[in-house]
């Protein structure tokens, strides 16, 4: 048996790869978890768990800083950001750093500063993580009772929840302060094709802000993803930041009510499952936001949305054929519907052809040409500006349809370029990661509930059918 390539062939299912391996003095016998179960070995060691989390934060911030500097080093100011595979610089540009009218990058120094600040921060976090993982106290309860905790201590858990909520609220207000006082943010709707501006007239009306939550998620409604002006976005952050901070204070000052103590499972794994569930929801919402919303994610930096690229194509050929003498108001297409313009089911004038399904797109280059009943024929004949033509021609050939082999744009479009839109990447990655987090939520929720009910040991291997079957060899 010792001559076999792998001894694992003869081991029952739940045995370790190597039961004798002890990392940092923590083996399976003392912790109940094997080395590969990672932080599960630290469930009751608050000091070591702190080290793991701080080190993890250091890795995250290190990636942000290093990737930021990598993008700065490769950045070509003459090309749009979305043609260069950038995912971090568009976020910095959206916050108003380094850009001017039309989303043109006029200064890359703020991007360099951002990368360096993140790298320096990651070094501090990395040092703290290593210190607490290797040198600091194993548990914090004795030396630093404020930072210590027991998972079953419901009052302490809600206090920690409160502190987290306050930090999230402060984060929301950082965006508010940037938009109000520190140079403003990039507004894709600014006249003439977008610019950085300070937001002065916040939307604080609760009926407007919470009205988004009551909208249908379908069609022209679009739930919160339909937000299309910065006053609402920044005003929403004022509301959200205030709710988080007030909720945080509430959770610090109060103890959980009896119904909450009964309804929830109070264990480390349960809290992990709640957190994973919340992150999954964030991931799914972020996916929809980056895919459809061109206000929070301006097309100048992230490339056009799918509907936007499609409408841009219809607009581009309307402009071309109108110059060649076509009467765009009455020309019929092959199906008998309008070739360039038609009416939506509710009567608005919209672009004809295949792009009719995207008729509720709103984009800054197109809205000036609308009247009270949809697209205005007289404006289409007299008011089209060169910047609108240039932008739509550019967006037409940059549809966010790129596959992994980088054949970007519409596959049959002869003017398409080799590129994958950051919108495709950000939407897909957040959906996939959100899905994985959701599966993790179900897994850990099931384990936590089973443990609370007292049967977490899993299947009894003594009566497994395979044990009574003839060995394969």
From Swiss-Prot:
The keyword Cell inner membrane does not apply. The gene is psbC. Pfam families: PSII. The chain crosses the membrane at residues 69-93, 134-155, 178-200, 255-275, 291-312, 447-471. It comes from the Eukaryota. SUPFAM superfamilies: Photosystem II antenna protein-like. It comes from Populus trichocarpa. The modification Phosphothreonine is found at residue 15. Keywords: Acetylation, Chlorophyll, Chloroplast, Chromophore, Manganese, Membrane, Metal-binding, Phosphoprotein, Photosynthesis, Photosystem II, Plastid, Thylakoid, Transmembrane, Transmembrane helix. GO terms for cellular component: chloroplast thylakoid membrane; photosystem II. It is found in: Plastid, Chloroplast thylakoid membrane. GO terms for molecular function: chlorophyll binding; electron transporter, transferring electrons within the cyclic electron transport pathway of photosynthesis activity; metal ion binding. GO terms for biological process: photosynthetic electron transport in photosystem II. [CaMn4O5] cluster binds at residue 367. This is Photosystem II CP43 reaction center protein. One of the components of the core complex of photosystem II (PSII). It binds chlorophyll and helps catalyze the primary light-induced photochemical processes of PSII. PSII is a light-driven water:plastoquinone oxidoreductase, using light energy to abstract electrons from H(2)O, generating O(2) and a proton gradient subsequently used for ATP formation. HAMAP family: PSII_PsbC_CP43.
């Amino acid at each position: 048996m010792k001559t076999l390539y792998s001894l694992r062939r003869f081991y029952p299912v739940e045995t370790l790869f190597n039961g004798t391996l002890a990392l940092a003095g923590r083996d399976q016998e003392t912790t109940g978890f094997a080395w590969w179960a990672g932080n599960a070995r630290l469930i009751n060691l608050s000091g070591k768990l702190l080290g793991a989390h701080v080190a993890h934060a250091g890795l995250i911030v290190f990636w942000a800083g290093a990737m930021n500097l990598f993008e700065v080093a490769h950045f070509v100011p003459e090309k749009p950001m979305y043609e260069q595979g950038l995912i971090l610089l568009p976020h910095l540009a959206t916050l108003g750093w380094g850009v001017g009218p039309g989303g043109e990058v006029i200064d890359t120094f703020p991007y360099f500063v951002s990368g360096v600040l993140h790298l320096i921060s990651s070094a501090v976090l990395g040092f703290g993580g290593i210190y607490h993982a290797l040198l600091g106290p194993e548990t914090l309860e004795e030396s630093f009772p404020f930072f210590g905790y027991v998972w079953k201590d419901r009052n302490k858990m809600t206090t920690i929840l409160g502190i987290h909520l306050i930090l999230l609220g402060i984060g929301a207000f950082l965006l508010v302060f940037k938009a109000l006082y520190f140079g403003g943010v990039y507004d894709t709707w600014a006249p003439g094709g977008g610019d950085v501006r300070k937001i002065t007239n916040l939307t604080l009306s609760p009926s407007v802000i919470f009205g988004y939550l009551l909208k249908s998620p379908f069609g022209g409604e679009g739930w919160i993803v339909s937000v299309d002006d910065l006053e609402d976005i920044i005003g929403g952050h004022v509301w959200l930041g205030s709710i988080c901070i007030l909720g945080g204070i509430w959770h610090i000052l109060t103890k959980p009510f009896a119904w909450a103590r009964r309804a929830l499972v109070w264990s480390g794994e349960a809290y992990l499952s709640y957190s994973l569930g919340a992150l999954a929801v964030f991931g799914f919402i972020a996916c929809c936001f980056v895919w459809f919303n061109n206000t929070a994610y301006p097309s100048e930096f992230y490339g056009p949305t799918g509907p936007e690229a499609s409408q841009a194509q219809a607009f581009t050929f309307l402009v071309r054929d109108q110059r060649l003498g076509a009467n765009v108001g009455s020309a019929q297409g092959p199906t008998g519907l309008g070739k360039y313009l038609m009416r939506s089911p509710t009567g608005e004038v919209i672009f004809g052809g295949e792009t009719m399904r995207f008729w509720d797109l709103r984009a800054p280059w197109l809205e000036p040409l609308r009247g009270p009943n949809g697209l205005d024929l007289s404006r289409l004949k007299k008011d089209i500006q060169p910047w609108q033509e240039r932008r739509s021609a550019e967006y037409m050939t940059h549809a966010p349809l790129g596959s992994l082999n980088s054949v970007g744009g519409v596959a049959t479009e002869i003017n398409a370029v080799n590129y994958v839109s950051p919108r495709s990447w950000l939407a897909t990655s957040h959906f996939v990661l959100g899905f994985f987090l959701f599966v993790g939520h179900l897994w850990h929720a099931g384990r936590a509930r089973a443990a609370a009910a007292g049967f977490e040991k899993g299947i009894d291997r003594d009566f497994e059918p395979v044990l009574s079957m003839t060995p394969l060899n």
